[in-house]
């Protein structure tokens, strides 16, 4: 799937992948303790349900900080599960061949939009489904809606980009869902080849290098992701014999979402 929106997205996050440093933004790495407190406090302006409602509106009023608290605040919600099953798996499989097409028919666009909206009800920050939704809006001639949701997607990508530079475990990008690793790289024009778990709490994504000087791969910090998974699945944590503060084994992942 190629279109001018993808190039706009690439331009928006082009600074994230040089070997020199992380993207220049005012956000920086997330303070997960502060986000945990604020996202579960009904009196906070960063209370997760408040930000979720704000995110769902067809406007561009959210700030960089609100996007950061919204993205990472999902980690601390009762229904959060990073390895949850694919939303509407049957439809997902049915639609897969369509994503090799450059243009979709009106009927195909309706199917893709409906599936994207169902997935976004489950995971509002699903980067891939946000991209699909934007593309449907553009093909349907709904330029204003495409721009609004492009704005939201760009800011979610910048939240991840600002969390590190991906070059070492210590400066790994911080993600909320495993699929975000692949979608983040793909939307940056980088193709993943393989994945390795790097103890205690990083995924290392091996990529197709663009040049000889390009990194062979990028690190993603999934420490809080794993911690929250084992909070929800304590029997698996017991089996893994993990210390309280350092997950050392990645749970079995389900198939990535389209």
Residue ranges of predicted features:
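Alpha-helical solenoid repeat scaffolds, predominantly canonical TPR units
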Residues: 108, 115-116, 149
């Amino acid at each position: 799937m190629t279109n001018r929106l993808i190039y706009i997205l690439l331009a928006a996050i082009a600074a994230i992948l040089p070997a020199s440093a992380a993207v220049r933004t005012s956000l920086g790495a997330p303070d997960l303790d502060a986000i945990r407190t604020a996202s579960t406090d009904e009196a906070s302006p960063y209370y997760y349900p408040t930000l979720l409602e704000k995110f769902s509106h067809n406007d561009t009023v959210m700030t960089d900080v609100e996007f950061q608290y919204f993205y990472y605040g999902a980690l601390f919600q009762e229904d959060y599960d990073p390895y949850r099953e694919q939303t509407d798996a049957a439809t997902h499989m049915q639609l897969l061949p369509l994503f090799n097409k450059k243009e979709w028919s009106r009927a195909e666009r309706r199917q893709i939009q409906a599936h994207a909206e169902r997935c976004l009800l489950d995971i509002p920050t699903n980067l891939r489904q946000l991209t699909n939704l934007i593309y449907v809006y553009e093909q349907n001639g709904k330029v204003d809606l495409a721009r609004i949701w492009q704005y939201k997607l760009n800011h979610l990508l910048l939240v991840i980009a600002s969390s590190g530079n991906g070059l070492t475990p210590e400066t790994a990008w911080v993600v909320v869902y495993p699929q975000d690793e692949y979608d983040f790289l793909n939307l940056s024009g980088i193709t993943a080849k393989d994945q390795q778990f790097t103890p205690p709490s990083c995924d290392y994504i091996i990529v197709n290098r663009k040049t000889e000087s390009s990194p062979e791969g990028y690190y993603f910090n999934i420490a809080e992701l794993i911690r929250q998974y084992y909070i929800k699945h304590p029997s698996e944590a017991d089996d893994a014999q993990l210390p309280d503060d350092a997950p050392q084994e990645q749970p079995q992942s389900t198939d990535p979402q389209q």
